[in-house]
From Swiss-Prot:
Its EC number is 3.2.2.-. SUPFAM superfamilies: FMT C-terminal domain-like (SSF50486). The lineage of its organism: Bacteria, Bacillati, Bacillota, Bacilli, Bacillales. Belongs to the DNA glycosylase MPG family. This is Putative 3-methyladenine DNA glycosylase. GO terms for molecular function: alkylbase DNA N-glycosylase activity; DNA binding. It comes from Listeria innocua serovar 6a (strain ATCC BAA-680 / CLIP 11262). HAMAP family: 3MGH. InterPro entries: Formyl_transferase-like_C_sf, MPG, MPG_sf.
């Protein structure tokens, strides 16, 4: 088993650095009698109080965003279009910044169960989007407020991407300058990246 990420991983790193550094890590969900996992290939950083695209812009504190003001490694799930999206809180308590997990490359041993969770979706469609990957992993709103360090969800060091590419975030129009922040990070060439064109897929993704 690869080394699990501990709270020290979040120390002395910015949210942007964390969004880059977890590319290639294995996201694991232990549920019932099986374990499902995949390698993170796409993330987005959300910079809290100063980021118009963040739920916590201007330090907005609501029932939904309350967990964003918690400690690093806390899990923030929310629903959008009947899908659950997965985020990790990144900064010290009181600073509501987070990283959204947008896409995974599933591990081989997880694919069969993931296909059942995704109602027989197969191939890249299995986990090439934030709502798809949570469904494949069996995550839900019940995971809101858990942490990566004392729950059935965790991160492990796993793969090293050949190139990490930074681009604009997806689905954040009309957010002023925040619309153009290059805060989406991908393992360049992965076929599991969301909104990917076939010509962008590469055979050389990991070191």
């Amino acid at each position: 088993m690869n080394a699990k990420i501990t709270p020290t991983f979040f120390e002395n790193r910015t949210t942007i650095e964390l969004a880059r550094d977890i590319i290639g890590m294995r996201l694991v969900h232990e549920i019932g009698n099986y374990t499902l996992s995949g390698y993170i290939v796409e993330t987005e950083a959300y910079l809290g109080a100063t980021d118009m695209a963040a739920h916590s812009f201007k330090n907005l504190r609501t029932k939904r965003t309350e967990v964003m003001f918690g400690t690093p490694g806390t899990i923030y799930t929310y629903q959008m279009h009947q899908q659950v999206l997965l985020n990790f809180i990144t900064m010290r308590e009181g600073i509501p910044e987070a990283v959204l997990i947008r896409a995974l490359e599933p591990t081989k041993e997880s694919i069969e169960q993931m296909e059942q969770n995704r109602f027989l979706k197969t191939g890249f469609e299995l986990t090439n989007g934030p709502g798809k990957l949570t469904q494949a992993l069996g995550l839900s709103m019940q995971d809101y407020g858990k942490t990566l360090f004392d729950s059935n969800i965790w991160l492990e060091r796993a793969k090293v991407p050949h190139i990490i590419e930074a681009t604009n975030r997806i689905g954040v129009p009309n957010k002023g300058i925040a619309t153009h922040y290059p805060l989406r990070f991908t393992a360049k060439g992965s076929p599991y990246i969301s909104a990917q064109r076939k010509r962008q897929i590469s055979a050389y993704i990991w070191e």
